[in-house]
């Protein structure tokens, strides 16, 4: 393999030695290193199983999508195979949410784990073509994956009649152009087809009508990387990792005001407090935690640090992204950064999200600068409440959520800004 100097030195730590087993150091692992460590043995085992059996194992493992929604992976695969082929498999590597860099570490350091997972997943759903849609800002990852695919072909793990099984598969890598919205599965499919990355109305869902109008499974990088372990260990043993209903390893990218930012591989019965203080070393300067942002999705206060890092109704959920804010941070300023992110990333397809995200950020900036009138405050509240119920896709559905949560959990901080602008005329 060639040298990839652009690989960042992200700190990685694991208590499970699974997804991050070979990803602790910032370098690419070749196929020979992967094979020495038992790589592609899960594929050999899978090709001696029926596709139906593999889907059943993944379903029984309780593996959930690691891209944010937490939908049961086995159920998604079952829905796909109910529809006649040809079928397609897509790896969603368009990781673009604030503070999220967990998939990157697999792509850039252990690409063959991902490729093995894609081959097994494609075999299970009966797909002969698979696509990796990678974020445009990951140039090293793009070339690493292309080289790794060529390595796998030379060893007989890709192409025609893989390992003499009669199963054929080609994997193609496509680069995004920096649009966060293309992480939404239907917008991703539109982009792959050469169209503008706009989400589709659902139903039909991609498992019914996806790429080129055919049944398509879209799974996240981390989700796919779990598949070889389910096959090699067996679903029963896999379910012993973490809580039985939310089994398997989970990657948590941690950033913000912590001593050891990085990616941590932990079971999902770990608490948010443990992630911050036991693994990430606590806060900088030992300051008090004010809030934790789950990427740009949710806001948790310091009173909620004992929640589990799982997908239960009271769990942390999402992508597992942890952004720590301390008592030194301004919650309104942080909320403004989130509003600006959504303003920049809305695709503009539907009016509620296009106009709503712009107005939300514009009015919030006026609030932050102390220039908001009472009408501005009322307008901000109205816009924030109405983006979600009237938007087409998930981006609009969550564009105001974290900001609303800061209003509810930190009313005293917002009140300070309200008092600043109380003397302004209407």
Curated annotation (Swiss-Prot):
NCBIfam families: PRK13596.1. InterPro entries: NADH-UbQ_OxRdtase_51kDa_CS, Nuo51_FMN-bd, Nuo51_FMN-bd_sf, Nuop51_4Fe4S-bd, Nuop51_4Fe4S-bd_sf, Soluble_ligand-bd. FMN binds at residues 176-223. It catalyses: a quinone + NADH + 5 H(+)(in) = a quinol + NAD(+) + 4 H(+)(out). PANTHER family: NADH-QUINONE OXIDOREDUCTASE SUBUNIT F. It is an enzyme of class 7 (translocase). This is NADH-quinone oxidoreductase subunit F. Keywords: 4Fe-4S, Flavoprotein, FMN, Iron, Iron-sulfur, Metal-binding, NAD, Quinone, Translocase. [4Fe-4S] cluster binds at residues 347, 350, 353, 393. Binds 1 FMN. The keyword Disulfide bond does not apply. Belongs to the complex I 51 kDa subunit family. NDH-1 shuttles electrons from NADH, via FMN and iron-sulfur (Fe-S) centers, to quinones in the respiratory chain. Couples the redox reaction to proton translocation (for every two electrons transferred, four hydrogen ions are translocated across the cytoplasmic membrane), and thus conserves the redox energy in a proton gradient. Its EC number is 7.1.1.-. NAD(+) binds at residues 65-74. One of its GO terms (molecular function) is FMN binding. It comes from Aquifex aeolicus (strain VF5). Its cofactor is FMN; [4Fe-4S] cluster.
């Amino acid at each position: 393999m060639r040298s990839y100097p652009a690989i960042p030195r992200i700190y990685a730590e694991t208590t499970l030695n699974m997804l991050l087993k070979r990803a602790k150091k910032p370098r690419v692992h070749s196929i020979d290193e992967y094979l020495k460590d038992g790589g592609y043995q899960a594929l050999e085992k899978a090709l001696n199983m029926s596709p139906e059996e593999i889907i059943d194992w993944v379903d029984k493992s309780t593996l959930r999508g690691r891209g944010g929604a937490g939908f049961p992976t086995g159920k998604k695969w079952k829905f796909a195979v109910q529809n006649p082929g040809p079928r397609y498999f897509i790896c969603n590597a368009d990781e673009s949410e604030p503070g999220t860099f967990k998939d990157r570490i697999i792509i850039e350091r252990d690409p063959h784990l991902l490729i093995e997972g894609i081959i097994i997943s494609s075999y299970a759903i009966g797909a002969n073509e698979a696509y990796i849609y990678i974020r445009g800002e990951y140039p090293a990852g793009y070339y690493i994956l292309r080289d790794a695919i060529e390595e796998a072909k030379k060893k007989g793990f890709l192409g025609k009649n893989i390992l003499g099984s009669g199963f054929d598969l080609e994997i193609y890598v496509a680069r995004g152009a920096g649009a966060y919205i293309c992480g939404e599965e239907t917008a991703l499919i539109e982009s792959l087809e050469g169209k503008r990355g706009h989400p589709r109305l659902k139903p039909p869902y991609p498992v019914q009508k996806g790429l080129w109008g055919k049944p398509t499974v879209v799974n996240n990088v981390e989700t796919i990387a779990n598949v070889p372990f389910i096959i090699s260990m067996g679903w029963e043993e896999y379910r012993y990792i973490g809580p039985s209903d939310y089994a398997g390893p989970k990657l948590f990218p941690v950033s913000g005001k912590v001593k050891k930012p990085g990616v941590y591989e932990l079971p999902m019965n770990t608490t948010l407090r443990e992630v911050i203080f036991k693994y990430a070393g606590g806060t900088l300067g030992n300051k008090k935690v004010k809030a934790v942002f789950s990427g740009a999705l949710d806001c948790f206060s310091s009173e909620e640090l004992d929640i589990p890092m799982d997908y239960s109704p009271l769990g942390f959920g999402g992508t597992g992204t942890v952004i720590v804010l301390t008592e030194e941070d301004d919650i309104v300023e942080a909320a403004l950064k989130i509003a600006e992110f959504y303003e920049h990333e809305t695709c503009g397809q539907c009016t509620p999200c296009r106009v709503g995200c712009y107005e939300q950020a514009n009015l919030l900036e006026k609030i932050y600068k102390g220039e908001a009138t009472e009408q501005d405050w009322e307008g901000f509240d109205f816009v924030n409440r109405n983006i979600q119920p009237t938007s087409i896709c998930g981006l609009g559905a969550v564009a105001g959520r974290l900001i609303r949560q800061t209003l509810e959990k930190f009313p005293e901080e917002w009140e300070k800004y309200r008092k600043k602008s109380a003397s302004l005329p209407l």
